[in-house]
Amino acid sequence: MEKKNETLWTEFVLTGLTCLPQWKPLLFLVFLVIYFMTIVGNLGLITLIWNDPHLHIPMYLFLSNLAFVDTWLSSTVTPRMLFNLLDKGKVISVAECKTQFFSFAISVTTECFLLAAMAYDRYAAICNPLLYPVIMTNRLCVRLLALSFIGGFLHAVIHESFLSRLTFCNSNIIYHFYCDVIPLLKISCTDPSLNYLIIFIFSGSIQVFTIMTVLISYTFVLFTILKKKSDKGIRKAFSTCGAHLLSVSLYYGPLLFMYVHPASSEVDDQDMILSLFYTVIIPVLNPIIYSLRNKQVIDSLKKMLKMMV
């Protein structure tokens, strides 16, 4: 029999990272510092790239957009998490929750496409250096960037549309520190099987496509590098590609586990830790990963610092 007089929740309660009061001040300070570093690092990288004409090439245009998306992703998740740790942001309306997830879905998916586009750019630059200016034109670069953001937007629209069919009448407690689709499905009183299928098909397809693009691109890059006889050329290629591969590995690992592994009705703390990794930790690491081993970025930073002194 169907339930009668069901109360549909209009607000959710985010449990946050921890329920232990003694840990909240320390966690707040730690993640506040991480968020500050994320904003400074990524916006600083964007400013550096756009102020240096020598960096106005596709490789750094992709990198500046990656920094923008990392800032977007972190700003979607971290402020709410910080308020939650202060016991001031636990309650969130259904509309706010869906808006946060929509913003989160756009940024996460866009980053997947950007990482794939960056891998193709490195393939073109290293495997076809003489033809690179012809292959990776400014027009193609802008198109790849536009497709990345459009793909992220459309993917978010699909999930948001299927999320709107759900009702929440049993529990309004979300065992997470932000509104993600999986925790929402776990508390839905509507059968979420279709939503899980949509996640598996669309999220899985996007991740498989982008990961395969990265792997195929870097397989060709690796063979090309091994054929090089110049030690300097090998070091430069490995330095550039190594940073990208590290970023890709750190980003895709948690995502694959979160959205492609079989769904479970149980609340898993491991899922929350993995989410923390790619929503908070990766955005602060990317500027470091891409900058410290990049001579052009370091040189540009030195020039900017000299001008400021």
Swiss-Prot record:
Any one annotated GO CC term: membrane
Name of the protein in question: Olfactory receptor 5H17
Cytoplasmic compartment residues: 50-56, 115-144, 220-239, 293-309
Keyword Disulfide bond in record: yes
Glycosylation positions in this chain: 5
Similarity comment text for this entry: Belongs to the G-protein coupled receptor 1 family.
Membrane topology per record: Multi-pass membrane protein
Keywords for this protein: Cell membrane, Disulfide bond, G-protein coupled receptor, Glycoprotein, Membrane, Olfaction, Receptor, Sensory transduction, Transducer, Transmembrane, Transmembrane helix
Role summary: Potential odorant receptor.
Pfam families for this protein: 7tm_4 (PF13853)
Molecular functions (GO terms): G protein-coupled receptor activity; olfactory receptor activity
Disulfide links within the chain: 97-189
Localization (cell): Cell membrane
GO process annotations (BP): G protein-coupled receptor signaling pathway; sensory perception of smell
Top-rank taxon: Eukaryota
Coiled-coil residues: none
InterPro entries linked: GPCR_Rhodpsn, GPCR_Rhodpsn_7TM, Olfact_rcpt, Olfactory_GPCR
Extracellular side: 1-28, 78-93, 166-198, 261-271
